[in-house]
A protein has these predicted regions:
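Short Lys/Arg-rich cationic patches that frequently serve as NLS/NoLS or arginine-rich RNA/DNA-binding motifs
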Residues: 1-10
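Long, low-complexity or tandemly repetitive, helically biased scaffold regions used
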Residues: 15, 21-117
Length: 117
């Protein structure tokens, strides 16, 4: 008989990276809602992104990670507010610029996260 040892590899989820990925997905949903002029989806997605911003803040505070770059949730919420203002004032340029800014914030945060932790 051969005795084989089974080892279980437990992958630890990087919650911050997971939140960033969810946020990027929601930003895509936000774009789709705007393109299809669906305000119900827009506000649902808007709320989801807001919640993810606060959730990420909580994760950074729990982890006490000084190396993780993240724009504060208030900065992200301000950006969302600017998107909302652009929508209601029919300012497509402002809306697109602010969505791009929001996307850049999340991508920058993702790049600063250690993918192995």
């Amino acid at each position: 008989m051969s005795s084989k040892k089974e080892t279980k590899v437990t992958k630890v989820t990087n919650h911050r990276l997971d939140i960033c990925n969810k946020t990027l997905y929601q930003i895509t949903n936000l774009k789709t809602a705007i393109i299809h002029n669906n305000l119900e989806d827009f506000f649902h997605t808007f709320t989801s992104i807001s919640n993810l911003c606060y959730e990420f803040d909580d994760q950074v505070n729990i982890m006490e990670d000084p190396n993780s770059l993240w724009y504060s949730s208030s900065t992200m919420i301000d950006c969302l507010h600017n998107i909302e203002e652009g929508i209601f004032s029919n300012n497509l340029f402002s809306t697109v610029c602010n969505i791009y800014t929001l996307e850049c914030m999340v991508n920058t945060a993702m790049d600063s996260i250690d993918k192995e932790s």
